[in-house]
């Protein structure tokens, strides 16, 4: 599966949108997300949905990379080669599947 411009990646409640993409790399920028509710009965896990094209500053990426985009190598460890991933400062960003992203606030 090839990453396209506009594709959204997620990691524990944070979302990133591809602003440029080639077969081997993707340039991403962080985007806003909205709180959708609680994902568990105890209130520790929160659900978030992305707001495409609403770019923000991300402290993990830094201000300059957030404004200009950060170019990352696309990796796909799946057998069927249909699950592209990006790695950002040790965090694994997965292609968003359309469901709310879960952020565990218990830590």
Annotate the PLM regions:
Residues 1-15, 24-107:
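Mixed-charge, low-complexity intrinsically disordered regions
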């Amino acid at each position: 599966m090839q990453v396209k411009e506009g594709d959204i990646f997620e990691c524990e409640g944070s979302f990133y949108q591809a602003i440029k993409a080639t077969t081997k790399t993707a340039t991403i920028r962080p985007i806003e997300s909205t709180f959708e509710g609680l994902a568990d009965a105890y209130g520790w896990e929160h659900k978030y949905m992305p707001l495409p094209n609403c770019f923000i500053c991300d402290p993990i990426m830094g201000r300059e990379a957030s404004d200009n985009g950060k170019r990352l190598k696309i990796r796909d460890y799946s057998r069927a080669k249909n699950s592209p991933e990006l790695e950002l400062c040790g965090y694994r960003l997965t292609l968003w599947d359309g469901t709310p992203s879960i952020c565990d606030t218990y830590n």
